[in-house]
């Protein structure tokens, strides 16, 4: 993790792969409420030198927020304010706009029946297992399964485990929360029971640190009764030296993100992948996208192909055969578990028609959250919105956490932990940050901003009304045809009602918010100053360490780094490029300059012509 303080410098949450289909990238990332899911993570340091964080709650308290008051109405009447004015928000949006040349969408042809038959192994009827005992697993593995409170295999586990135990390659797709992690981890641990523990045998690749941490946690619990089986973790954001020491022990299984794995292969002398027998790619759809293409190619070139079993798992495995060929799969078995096309039967969908009252949304959200003690997830479109709402609601006395890409790794995990323990009952998050987030016992989901597609809507509201429990979703609906179409699909596929709202009360609350806009600006400014002070302290400490330990630093072997094409595109003059600018750069690279030449451009061309003469 770099030594700098993360800031919220752009409205949109940007994904490295820049995928427009968010429903296709949902990591099997579960935080189990009923278990102690963060205990094993305490063995890791999040950084070699701890980065201090700004205590935003303390700033909010100084401004009069987060008071332990019994009467929420008194807090509301105290009149704490909303954030930037509408004009300022529009100016921020304009800064994000970049003229992008129009690109025609290329529709990839679907794989033919002949190509599918030639590439995949011919499917044969499989036994449906209703018990883990019928899978003929060993006693230590069954004990681990029992401690995880698994009673019977899920459809993806029933279909995948027997095939994986045979050593065959697998291409599998199943929705988030279907048990994909168990589908590959159970057969891996079962197979390792009978192999000597002399070197690393299994690599599990995940696209995100959170998913890697969750898989690591799951594997540790599942293998609790297995003797002499070690699991290692190699992800960014955790102590590099500590990971190197762990990899020196040659753990049987290494769970890693692509970049950090390449780093260790290149720079950790005691770590080798020459004996790898199983390669698992979790969220394979996303890993095969352009954002991870270079890293994946590098890893595949380093891991021996012979006698390697490859297991691909994803929420929606719709990758074309042409993209799978590079993985050197040997007649893989294709397993697809269809996701539901409707909401849970016990979910009550409520819709609030906003019309042209967008300015009342913060006040309306406050009304809905007053007095809430159960877990509530609020979805927003932008990380800036999540941060601002956290401050506003905090000033009004509500305990709220945020989850988005501008937070550090430690902040994200701590916020989720606080949410799980009900220390903070409300979590405001973006779709990208909450990919695959599966926390049981969520009673209410609020769509503050409407999702882009019905599939994303299903993923959002699917976080409540799980395991036969009742649940409620409340969605703020605008006037666009796209939003109306999503509501229509939701009602057709489940029960939905219009929610009655006291608009008069919302307007009164909004007036109080508008009258105190300066308060939120003061909080944001104080937070910014505190971050700048921390950054200066860190730079001073870094410079001091460079002088103090100069000899030791120069004596270390130089590390080599891998930087693919996408990382080159992501940075320009040391600054992050947002998604719109990146798209424009990609088009210009492919098609040449398609924008108007500037005065500087014309002068360069003129000088070139003169030099030729």
UniProtKB/Swiss-Prot annotation:
A GO CC annotation given for this chain: nucleolus
Keyword NAD in record: no
UniProt EC number: 3.6.4.13
Compartments (UniProt record): Nucleus, Nucleolus
UniProt binding sites for ATP: 174-181
Major location category of this protein: nucleus
Organism: Candida albicans (strain SC5314 / ATCC MYA-2876) (Yeast)
Region described as Disordered: spans on this chain: 1-20, 79-104, 571-613
Family: Belongs to the DEAD box helicase family. DDX27/DRS1 subfamily.
UniProt catalytic activity: ATP + H2O = ADP + phosphate + H(+)
Function in brief: ATP-binding RNA helicase involved in ribosome assembly.
Pfam hit, one: Helicase_C
Protein's recorded name: ATP-dependent RNA helicase DRS1
Feature: compositional bias, Basic residues: 572-583
GO molecular function, one term: ATP hydrolysis activity
Bias kind Acidic residues: ranges: 9-18, 88-100
InterPro entries: DEAD/DEAH_box_helicase_dom, DEAD_box_RNA_helicase, Helicase_ATP-bd, Helicase_C-like, P-loop_NTPase, RNA-helicase_DEAD-box_CS, RNA_helicase_DEAD_Q_motif
Motif Q motif per UniProt: ranges: 130-158
Subunit structure: Associates with pre-ribosomal particles.
Domain Helicase ATP-binding: 161-335
Helicase C-terminal domain boundaries: 364-541
Keywords noted in UniProt: ATP-binding, Coiled coil, Helicase, Hydrolase, Nucleotide-binding, Nucleus, Ribosome biogenesis, RNA-binding
Biased segments, Basic and acidic residues type: 584-604
């Amino acid at each position: 993790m770099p030594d700098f303080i993360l800031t919220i410098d752009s409205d949109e949450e940007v994904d490295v792969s820049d995928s427009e289909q968010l429903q296709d990238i949902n990591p099997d990332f579960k935080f189990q409420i009923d278990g102690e899911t963060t205990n094993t993570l305490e063995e890791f340091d999040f950084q070699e030198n701890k980065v201090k964080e700004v205590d935003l709650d303390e700033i909010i308290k100084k401004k009069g927020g987060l008071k332990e008051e019994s009467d929420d109405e008194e807090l509301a009447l105290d009149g704490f304010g909303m954030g930037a004015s509408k004009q300022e928000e529009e100016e921020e949006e304009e800064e994000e706009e970049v003229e992008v040349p129009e690109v025609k969408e290329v529709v990839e042809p679907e794989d033919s029946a002949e190509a599918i038959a030639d590439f995949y192994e011919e499917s044969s009827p499989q036994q449906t297992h209703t018990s883990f005992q019928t899978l003929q697993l060993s006693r230590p593995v069954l004990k681990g399964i029992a401690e995880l409170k698994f009673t019977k295999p899920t459809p993806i586990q029933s279909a995948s485990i027997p095939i994986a135990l045979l050593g065959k390659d697998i291409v599998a797709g199943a929705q988030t929360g279907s048990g994909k992690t168990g589908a590959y981890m159970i057969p891996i641990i079962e197979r390792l029971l009978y192999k000597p523990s002399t070197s690393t045998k299994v690599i599990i690749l995940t696209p995100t640190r959170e998913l890697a941490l969750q898989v690591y946690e799951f594997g540790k619990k599942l293998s609790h009764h297995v003797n002499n089986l070690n699991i290692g973790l190699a992800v960014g954001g955790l102590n590099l030296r500590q990971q190197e020491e762990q990899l020196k022990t040659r753990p049987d299984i290494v769970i890693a993100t692509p970049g950090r794995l390449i780093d260790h292969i290149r720079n950790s002398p005691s770590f080798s992948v020459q004996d790898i027998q199983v390669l698992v790619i979790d969220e394979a759809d996303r890993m095969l996208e352009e954002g991870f293409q270079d890293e994946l190619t590098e890893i595949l070139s380093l891991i021996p192909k012979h006698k390697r079993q490859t297991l691909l798992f994803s929420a929606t495995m719709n990758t074309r055969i042409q993209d799978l060929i590079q993985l050197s799969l040997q007649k893989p078995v294709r397993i697809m578990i269809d996701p539901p096309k409707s909401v849970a039967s016990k979910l009550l969908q409520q819709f609030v028609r906003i019309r042209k009252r967008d300015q009342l949304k913060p006040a309306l959200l406050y009304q809905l959250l007053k007095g809430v003690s159960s877990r509530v997830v609020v979805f927003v479109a932008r990380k800036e919105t999540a941060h601002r709402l956290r401050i506003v609601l905090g000033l009004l006395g509500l305990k709220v956490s945020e989850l988005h890409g501008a937070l550090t790794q430690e902040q994200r995990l701590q916020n989720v932990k606080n949410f799980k323990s009900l220390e903070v009952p409300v979590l405001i998050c973006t779709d990208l940050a909450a990919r695959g987030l599966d926390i049981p016992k969520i009673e209410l989901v609020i769509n503050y901003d409407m999702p882009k597609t019905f599939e994303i809507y299903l993923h959002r509201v699917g976080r409540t009304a799980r395991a036969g429990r009742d649940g409620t979703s409340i969605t703020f609906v605008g006037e666009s045809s796209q939003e109306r179409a999503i509501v229509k699909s939701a009602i057709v596929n489940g029960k939905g009602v219009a929610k009655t709202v006291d608009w008069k009360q919302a307007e009164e609350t909004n007036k109080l918010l508008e009258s105190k806009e300066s308060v939120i600006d003061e909080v944001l400014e104080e937070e910014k100053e505190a971050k700048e002070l921390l950054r200066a302290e860190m730079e001073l400490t870094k410079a001091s360490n460079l002088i103090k330990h100069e000899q030791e630093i120069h004596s270390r072997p130089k590390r080599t780094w891998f930087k693919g094409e996408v990382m080159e595109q992501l940075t320009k003059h040391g600054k992050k490029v947002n998604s719109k600018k990146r798209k424009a750069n990609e088009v210009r690279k492919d098609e040449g300059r398609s924008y108007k030449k500037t005065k500087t451009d014309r002068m360069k061309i003129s000088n070139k012509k003169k030099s030729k003469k």
